Amino acid sequence: PGVNDVDSTKVRIFSYGGFNSPYKQLSRFVKLQYKEELVQHVSVPMLISIMTPEDRSGRSGDHVPFRQKNFAACRFTSANEHGNASNGVGYTDRQHTSGDILGIDTDFNGQIDSFFVDFNYLARNAVINGAAATIVAKGPKKPDFSISTIVGPGLIVEITDQTQYSTYRVGLRTLTND
């Protein structure tokens, strides 16, 4: 996408590590939970893309220090962004830099009337973020487990701790991040 391109139906999730990292697992669970629990209740469905890198090129977010303290963490970002975090002459950015542009006065009446935000898009993403925060807060601790036997097209998973829960759901991923 180019500068000022808009995509109001997609959100990207960035997280650290390879396919099986706890961070990518959290990202996949957020996407799965959205597809299974939320999408049927929304008027404009969102496409969630799980990205390979930990964050966008030249950027970093609050999820990094959480990951550094061994918390599963991920970052939600818009599908397209204005700018690439460079600091060259004449560069403008609206992505929480020290030179943020809050908005502009499009009709020159002294009032900011364009905030560079689609508030409907923001609301849809807030629902996804809120649901993710809820499942992380309410969910059980991740159990230790072993795969004891591979049986035909399936496998047997043995939960070795956190056994107070009667049921665990085991998900298998595709060969891509999603």
Where do the language-model regions lie?
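Active-site-adjacent mobile loop/cap segments within catalytic or ligand-binding domains
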Residues: 1-5, 50-140
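Metal-dependent peptidase/peptidase-like ectodomains
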Residues: 1-64, 69-73
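Hydrophobic alpha-helix feature that most strongly marks membrane-spanning transmembrane helices
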Residues: 35, 134-138, 175
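Proline-enriched interdomain boundary motifs that mark the N-terminal boundary
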Residues: 138-150
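A broad structural signal for short, well-ordered beta-strand segments within beta-sheet-rich domains
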Residues: 143-144, 163-167
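Conserved aromatic anchor
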Residues: 153-164
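Beta-strand signatures of extracellular beta-sandwich domains
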Residues: 169-173
